[in-house]
Amino acid sequence: MKNGKTCFGVIIGTRAYFNSELAKDVRKQLLKTLDEGGYEYIILPEDATPTGSSSIETREDGLKVSKQFREHRDEIDGIIVSLPNFGFEIGIINAISDADLNVPVLVQACDDENDKVDLDSRRDAFCGKISVCNNLYQYGIPFTDTTLHTYSIYDPLLKKDIDKFAAICRVVNGLRHCRLGQIGTRPLGFNTCRASEKLLQRSGITVVPADLSEILYAAQKIKDDDPKFIEMCNRTCNYAKVPDSYKEKLGLQAKFSVAVENWIEANDVQAVAIQCWDSLEQNYGCAPCVTMSMLSEKLIPAACETDLAGAVSMYALALASKNAPALLDWNNNFAEDRNKCVCTHCGNFPKQFVGNGDLKLGPLGVLGRTLGKINTFGAVYAKVSEGPFTFFRISTDDPKGQIKAYLGKGEITNDPYGMDGCIAVTKVDNLQKLMKYICKNGFEHHVAMCRTDVVDILNEAIETYLGWNLYVHE
């Protein structure tokens, strides 16, 4: 990141015996597209090489780029290679391999025009791109392709491909440097929420643990005149409707939220998994659902039941979409419609995911019957608005020593369903096939969702760069 924006290292490839004006035009239009998209970039000065236009050809040119890229290592999120003509693979591959940034790479090449293939106008980038990609493959450098093999630098596809690539960079870099909070142990009754810290760490995901008692002690020390506490009470009331009968519980809930947010900030955590039952209700007197909902709303995904892998799944969706994700149970069949099911949770969905402002706070439903309604206040009640969604789930498979995942998309319907908590009636094509895959491959009953289509983004990020075992549901 540079100045809070996604930053690309830009390489313009060329060959001296092609018209240098082709590279000049491509440089101008590519940088214009990046500027209009709100991106930062690192590129050689126009006069840095004999071919001009910031373009590179030889190994020596490539080493100038690699030196520049290394100087901006902490800023560059991905590398964009643009080929205005055939390009020269030697300069490009030396630039990328010597820089050794370990970031995603996008390779784009320009169309020839049928009436402009004379010696002054021809590009041959169609062929040159194959050579550049062959070199990347030889060097073991993973890369992303554009929608079409070649297209005009003025084609709207360029912006779409860059925006998609930026999202891929966010996912890859975000997960490789993620600090994942764990507040409390998993619930006693949920072996299904086990996860391997060591397998997560191998992908760059560091688990940062805290005992639940630390958070409860911090919450109990917060005074009623603490500005953060007063602000949290107001934020919560503005976020969801608080019934008059539970107003006295709002303070307890708000202090827990402040303690959690303070811990997250102090430990530089990007996502968190929380032990949401039943110690918190028995030893403190509230449920953490609205805390988790409000965290997810501001893109700090918070997973229930100390589901570490679920929190990672939510974070991946947040990075890909820049939208608030939710963690749901694949919970109920929907009558005898075998492509529909009810996805629900006690009450942790963020407002953006719900898609409407009709959120109300109350006690947990099932747990409220056993732990007492007064001790389980904090659940969000909401009916999710209809529309598309992406679903995603990772799991650490210890026997196989790998991280595995599944990915797909569906529709949330407007069907009524008489259940408390957060409710989403979903429709997924070939749902029975998906359920068989989940069961046969030992996945958990939790699934992460967001309200936009980011299947292609996650597919590319995982298969090309993260190397997890991925099933994409069709």
Describe each model-derived feature in a short phrase:
Residues 54-74, 88, 252-259:
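Glycine-rich, highly charged phosphate/nucleotide-binding loops
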Residues 28-29, 369-474:
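Extended hydrophobic packing segments that form well-structured cores
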Residues 31-52, 142-148, 206-211:
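Short beta-strand elements in bilobed, periplasmic/extracellular small-molecule ligand-binding domains
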Residues 299-417:
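C-terminal catalytic subdomain
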Residues 94-123, 130-135, 293-306:
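Short, acidic/small-residue loops that bind anionic groups at enzyme active sites
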Residues 75-85, 104-108, 269-275:
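Periplasmic-binding protein-like
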Residues 5-9, 113-231, 237-240:
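Cap/lid and interdomain-hinge subdomains that line or gate substrate/regulatory clefts
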Residues 231-235, 239-320:
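Long, internal scaffold/assembly segments composed of regular secondary structure
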